[in-house]
């Protein structure tokens, strides 16, 4: 009996002492009806989720906790300059679901949240790094404001942070060109009856930063200082000033003399390093953005 007790004690000690070295469970990324191809040299799973085209890229060797980056729109724009392939090479998964030109509307956020739930259920980290390119800034920041505890970081690139600037062209400084057709779509999707209602709307990223700061969401924004489509002075620079006042973490990278294009950086290493630092750890594997939503 004493021999059995000693063996049991030693077994408990070994498991307690070395359990962290045991291989972690791998994400289940085999989706119903999926097809597979290569994305920048890595395996990509392509599938349909709630009638929306979606995909997830697997790294060759995943980082502990299975962190991931999530591009909200324009996943094929300036890809090599916007850090995603480099993050996958560093062990991130990378995901996308096509919700169209929906400007972070409530209906789009519902689909994004359900997709997020599904990927967490399948084994990815609960807090991804969001990538918001151009109008994707509205998508990324609005999603993070709705679910701040479910986002680790945001990378915004020439990112729209105030719809009055773009597509409205009606921010205080009126520095941006605006887009009348997109402005009309934006108002319709957000249930805003007219210009007056849209100008008074309080759902812009510049106005919804407090929840992100409280949740510790780290922000990095890359801006072209000569951007006259999404002027930094009406968008990312406002976010930076307000986020710092709230005690949030934000880094700005300026591109002197550069306009709205090209997005990204000749060498995106600073963005990659920032996202690894703030979103590449073991990760929070708590439930998805809406507890119990599946």
Predicted feature locations:
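C-terminal catalytic histidine-bearing segment of alpha/beta-hydrolase fold enzymes
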Residues: 229, 233-292
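Short amphipathic alpha-helix adjacent to the substrate-entry channel of hydrolases
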Residues: 78-95
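The feature captures the conserved acid-bearing segment of alpha/beta-hydrolase catalytic domains
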Residues: 173-237, 241-244
